[in-house]
Amino acid sequence: VWFAAGQSNMELQIVAGSPRSRDGNGLLLTSMARLPYVRFAKNRKTWSVAPTNAAYAGWQRFEPASFAIVKSPASALSALAFYYARELYLALDIPIGIVDSSWGGTNIDAWTPREGYDLHPELAPGKYPVTANWNPSLAKGAISGGCQQPTVIYNAQLAPVAPFAVRGAIWYQGEHNTNHEDEVPTYAARMHALHDGWKKTFENPDFKLYFVQIAQYWCGDDEKRLDRWFDVQRQQEKFAEEEPNAGMAVTSDVRSWKDVHPRSKLAVARRLLLLALKRDYGFSDVVCDSPVFEKATRLDNGDVKLEFRHAPKGWYVYNDDFSQELSFELRDADGVWHPAQVRNLHKPTYVWDGASGVGRDAHLVIGWAPGAHVFAPKG
């Protein structure tokens, strides 16, 4: 059993809603969804300033009749949750359960239990509408924030089923936090608080959290917001590096540049699936991690050698415009950037020419242009 939680990209529905707010293939695939050993539950949107015991969801079957009912919980099921459960079942041939607890526009704090903040007290001061002993209170401001108040969605949607036995959660959230400049530098710490809190309340020290890199999005002329967007992505990477029971599905190539809600969730679900198959279900040959830049080494001839983790057999570039060039530039001592000449395409290491007179102490940037993607041979 897995939870599916997060904001609007997790909530994007498999069938219900307008064409813009549902998955592009959902109507077709749900009409063929006859999976007798898969069950799902769709949580109702509700919040509470104190933990509750009332659960507003029940198990339903993965079958066409369920999804065909207009405005039913099935028709509003998260597309990502649908695909993740379906792909797990097809890969494992065992019973699978998925609980959808998504809510668009919500921040990470609302999903975090108080136990998470007990373990990360640096995040708590002056933030939460409760007393020092965490007794429920209606202090000034406690209601005005609605579902954005810290802990309130956890209290109403997850607390009623903890410590229900679950393997872990898939998580797609972070876009909301880019709106708050003061929260961006601590987003990795907030993910730790969320994960540590869930591990404790579900009494599962190996609770897995497989999450999606926030969608690539064109922020118009708002350069500050674009910077915050990329900073949250870096915070997500930081958390994934620090937490062995977490993994990030990179999706920079799976997006609609001017729509923060990409409609095709199948590719995203399959990348989350690879993490679970590799780390939880014994598929040792599966490649689940994307290439990560590790180091650059200046060679005696002036070239610079690049090395990437998770790409032992090499890596390649494939861009939105179908080109296979990655943007490299070198900065000289005067701060002037120079295009770099690429060599040795598709080798385990990537080398480009550093003979343009920039000097041995040059700075470098890699893949800075939008739409440039690095892949390992298997993805």
Task: Go through the PLM ranges and name each one.
Residues 1-379:
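Cell-envelope and extracellular/periplasmic
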